[in-house]
From Swiss-Prot:
This is Inversin. GO terms for cellular component: cilium; cytoplasm; membrane; microtubule; nucleus; spindle. The gene is INVS. The D-box 1 (destruction box 1) mediates the interaction with APC2, and may act as a recognition signal for degradation via the ubiquitin-proteasome pathway. Residues 638-649, 863-872, 1051-1061 have a biased composition (Polar residues). It is a peripheral membrane protein. May be ubiquitinated via its interaction with APC2. The modification 3-hydroxyasparagine is found at N75. One of its GO terms (biological process) is protein localization to ciliary inversin compartment. A motif (D-box 2) lies at residues 910-918. Required for normal renal development and establishment of left-right axis. Probably acts as a molecular switch between different Wnt signaling pathways. Inhibits the canonical Wnt pathway by targeting cytoplasmic disheveled (DVL1) for degradation by the ubiquitin-proteasome. This suggests that it is required in renal development to oppose the repression of terminal differentiation of tubular epithelial cells by Wnt signaling. Involved in the organization of apical junctions in kidney cells together with NPHP1, NPHP4 and RPGRIP1L/NPHP8. Does not seem to be strictly required for ciliogenesis. Keywords: ANK repeat, Calmodulin-binding, Cytoplasm, Cytoskeleton, Developmental protein, Hydroxylation, Membrane, Microtubule, Nucleus, Repeat, Ubl conjugation, Wnt signaling pathway. Its main location: cytoplasm.
Amino acid sequence: MNRSENLFFSGSSLASQVHAAAINGDKGALHRLIIGNSALKDKEDQFGRTPLMYCVLADRLDCADALLKAGADVNKTDHSQRTALHLAAQKGNYRFMKLLLTRRANWMQKDLEEMTPLHLATRHKSPKCLALLLKFMAPGEVDTQDKNKQTALHWSAYYNNPEHVKLLIKHDSNIGIPDVEGKIPLHWAANHKDPSAVHTVRCILDAAPTESLLNWQDYEGRTPLHFAVADGNVTVVDVLTSYESCNITSYDNLFRTPLHWAALLGHAQIVHLLLERNKSGTIPSDSQGATPLHYAAQSNFAETVKVFLKHPSVKDDSDLEGRTSFMWAAGKGSDDVLRTMLSLKSDIDINMADKYGGTALHAAALSGHVSTVKLLLENNAQVDATDVMKHTPLFRACEMGHKDVIQTLIKGGARVDLVDQDGHSLLHWAALGGNADVCQILIENKINPNVQDYAGRTPLQCAAYGGYINCMAVLMENNADPNIQDKEGRTALHWSCNNGYLDAIKLLLDFAAFPNQMENNEERYTPLDYALLGERHEVIQFMLEHGALSIAAIQDIAAFKIQAVYKGYKVRKAFRDRKNLLMKHEQLRKDAAAKKREEENKRREAEQQKGRLSPDSCRPQALPCLPNTQTDSHKQSRAPSKQPPSSEAAQDPDKRACRGGPGRVSPSRAPQKEQHLSPDVQGTVPRKPNESPREQCKGRSACVHFSPSEGSDGKRHPGVSSVEKSRSETGGEQRCDKGKGFLKQPSCLRVAGPGDEGEDPGWAAASLPQQDGHRKPSRRQDTASKAKCTSQKRRVQELRGGRHSPAGSSRPGSAKGEVVHAGPNALQHRTPRNKTTQDKLAGGIYSDLPQNTEVLRSGVRKSGTSTLSEDAQVSKETDPAPGPLSGQSVNIDLLPVELRLQIIQKERSRKELFRKKNKAAAVIQRAWRSYQLRKHLSHLLHMKELGARDVDRWNRECLALLLQVWRKDLELTPPKTTAVTRTTKSLSKGSSGAKSTRHSVLKQIYGCSQEGKVPHSTRSSRTHSVLHLNSVSNLQCIHLLENSGRSKNFSYNLQSATPPKTKTKLRPSLEEECVRGSWNS
């Protein structure tokens, strides 16, 4: 020991002085201490060692001899159960071992590791100590085993001491005893990297060169050749394989032969040696079907691979999954091996696929070896080869997130628009792996971020499933829609709530994700329901704060709305049934009236036939209403209409029928618009007292014939109308002021046709009979006129196509034709119309008529005659408001189809222009009012942000704005009648708040897209304040008090996030008065 230790022992207790004297070799001090106290000779220190042990450690032979003579115990053990003989054998001290053995030391004593002094003696190169111990041992004690069941021969082979091995074998030591791992001494001798270990191996093999000894397998199936190959000891391998009984192709427990081990570790020389001494000629494979060439290829040992490929017995066979050694090399990035194989094997198939369809490029892309991918692409590897999952190498790279490989493949021509068998795109696999950079690269290469697979899932949903926030942010920044639903109705928010990713939920809501989207299945779960099922308390609280609803809450709201809609449906259905019933009664009444008119016309025709037989009644009278009559006679013809009918006419039914029918009211009771009309203009069809002029027009069957007439000289004169022919078709007689009889006015006048040229336009004066001329129509003329009128009626029906316009139709051309009065009374009409409208009709509609209808225009625009001016003067005197021109309108069914369409189109365009002008004016006025109100509201908000000191003034401004909005609403909104009477108190308290609450809650449920709006583009949470300002500037006055009474609608929190509260509010009484006032109005 050193000096400090000596001082320590000498300066402590008495026992320490004895140990110190033994270490220092102070024999005198040791003798004095032992004489003074005999117990000190075996005194133990803190390690349990006696002075004799310290004498062995310090090599104090004389002190040890003195202690043994004084009676010290030679077999005393320390705390490790080792005696002085153990220590002497461990140090290899031959003199102490001899001294102790002569003093009968126990050579079979075992320490805590169950090792005897014989085990410890094998550590030293000198065999003297081992030979000394073997002299004292019996023949069976040499194979004593330690705790690991190893004998002294195991330790000698381990320490590579061939002399010890020979000595132990000479003393009958067993060379076939396995230790705890199943290894025999030959395993330990072969498991040595020193080439000199071959001597130990030879010593053991020389003792028993048996096949069992050479091919002994430990508990893991490894032979001594496996260990020799593992250490790369070529000499030992050469010695072992030199024996013919050595099995080169023996398997271990993993079905790997020594050749597999040599290929895996890259020992090319050993590989060559084993291939040469392999007598079987076959290359075995392991449990996965991999050959030693696979092992060499994946480890990038090009020299070893070259040795394999040059040997004729080696073939590049596939493993159990169909992968060759070339694929193994590509998967491990063994570029040197790939180049070697491509150079040595010209027939190698670079695009060969395994049983799953994967190629070498698939394996390289999956592992992320950029250099390998480039090497394969340079050697014409197929860049878009697909496996059984329809995955290309680019899919494998996107799944693992290898950016460099992805860019290399895209530059090499890989397609980015492919999908696999499940419809997953490259972006789906990148999102499933959470690779945000890869997602950005793919989006830059024109991949749609909203692409859906066959289940309807988007890449954003895949990223939300894993909670990859960075990937989700990249997708939504590139316009990924967070509200897209898959086929089951789930969105990205459903997946985030299901897995409890709060940060992902916040990100989705910041990008305008709809929190109340429902599934398509029977449960109809919302994202909040997923959070409730998973008991995600933080997510539940956050979703409720942002207006999320469960399916139970949505069903309650839907039930409320359905009830309201059903009530409205019942009211509308009752109204519709009532309306249909009234219309049915009205139609029956009209049918009865038409039937009655038809019977009256038949009766009147019979009376006319009787009247023709009498010569007095058939005498023609003067026609004061025709254009050629004098002004005085025209004025006098109006006089009888202003006088009440005589008693004779009231009593005689035949006379009453000739004056216009039995139901004709007196001029004193008729409206003013009918009192000024003469009997000539009012027509011949009788009308009931309660029948309107429109209904009377429907009952007529008047017509206009556009055809030339034939004169007395045999020539065809334009517009010559035979009175005899027309008298047979008249439906009644009109009274004239000068004539004492009745004047039969024809209801159908013949108008000049297109073939008449060069005739006088004033044909009416020449063709119609004068007052003093009397002509009696012959029977042949009556028959001819009847036939012509019948054919004309048939032609009218053909032109109409059998269609009858409904009563009261406002469609142009839907009214039935009327009589064209060629006289001055034709300017008179039944209903009043201003002069502007009259001019428009005269110049607009009738300007489109052809030249052959000049008679129709002359009745409207003939200003040269004095008769027309006098008629207009009389019309002003009798009726201050001139009537419309429908009284002189032609039968539009007789006009050509093209002309009718032009008239209808012109009328429609005029109405459409008028409607557009009104709509534009309303839009301009509404926009100006909205601008003023928004300007006022912005001013108030600016005052509030600046912290206005005068709070009362700000309140007054707010109240003024509120009243202004309320006044506008009252002016624009018509009063609505409610079917159910309510009290003023209930309306003022509940109605406005309930309306606004239902509107906002439905908006939360169905979102903005359900209101007919275009979905907003994804935007950050910073834009929410701008949207809130826009919503505040809305002109719906109900929204200003949206929060009033909202919490009373439901017992749970269903409303959306309320707007931030201001410091100053309107007084509750003022708000209630405003609401009450709006409902009362």
